[in-house]
Amino acid sequence: MTQAIHAQNISYPNSLKGNVSDTYFGKEIKDPYRWLEDDLSEETKAWVLEQNKVAFGHLEKIPFRQDIVRRLTAMWNYERISAPFKKGKNTYFYKNNGLQNQSVLYKKTKKGEEVFLDPNTFSKDGTTSLAGLNFSKSGKFCAYQISVAGSDWRKVILIDTKTKAILEDTLIDVKFSGISWFKDEGFYYSSYDRPKGSELSEKTDQHKLYYHKLGTKQKDDVLIFGGNDAQKRRYVSGSVSKDMKYLFISAANSTSGNELYFKDLSKKDSPIVAIVANFENDHYILDTRKGKFYIVTNKNAPNKKIVITDAANPNPENWKDFIAETNQVLSPSTGSGFIFAHYMIDAVSAVKQYDYNGKLVREIKLPGVGTASGFGGEDKDKELYFSFTNYVTPGTIYSFNPKTGENKIYQRPKVQF
């Protein structure tokens, strides 16, 4: 039956060949299908429509297609709940009833739970998705990003977490950006200048970091980094330390290797200071404590390590190893006043718990042989959460007591297989 389907002759629509070419280093390179790069043209839309007719016409002839649909639906149709996380006085978690296109964000209440944000209501056709979400320091405000039809150009919408009222501070044309709040006053975000042509094919190579103050217009946002040729970078991001004292800036021209800068937010008009001023390695700030920076780096450590340095002398020559490199790749997280070092050893998770003096507190006993992720949270959290799964265990959420090292099941999915 399958062979008969494959043996059918498929008549594909004609794809027009153009006469476009470029010359690089004296050699002509033909590009006959460049017209398809214009995703907004009527010609491209018509071409996609005809291609879809052929593809779906072929797929609809598969005799066992509905059997596959029924089996996959049965396997996917079970409730999934994420690990809870606290923001301010509220506790949130994501839940999917099994067949929802996007998980719904819930807030715990005295009576149980309530829907806080449902991405499935963003559009009637389901093509608008939740692309990011961040809460302000006290949890009073939430900024979330939406993406339409998978576009990297996003809109940032702000809401009051108590009333769920949408604020007037909606931002547009935000691309490749996180949101990092400074207290409840505003936040840092990144974007490019809006391209004049197609958003899918026009060049964007100068990322800029901005600060948006609540209650102001986007056009009045303050440019922090990336506004001149000396600061021209393809990717720029900003993150505020947990104590709200420092802004850290990562700048890169590719997906490997980045510069690292910081700005003291406790001092008015403080300069941007370089920590690393080259693209030779990857670095990011894990945490800060009492003027000390905890940096994750692969400088002289391909499997990554954590170093500690002083804000007064942050350059690499002053770095000291905090958690040294091992034979396994390091993936750290922080929570409850501890640092958790996650390693994969022969495809099996191993997690170690350290205090901020670098002392090993314990090697965490996991529920079994498998993959664990999580252990992140705020310093004041008295319990943390992690997920665990293996070949015979669907993703299960555990609560973890950082003082005793004990863990227990928080939520186990009920599957039908």
Task: Name what the model sees in each region.
Residues 14, 28-417:
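Peripheral, non-catalytic segments that deliver or gate enzyme domains
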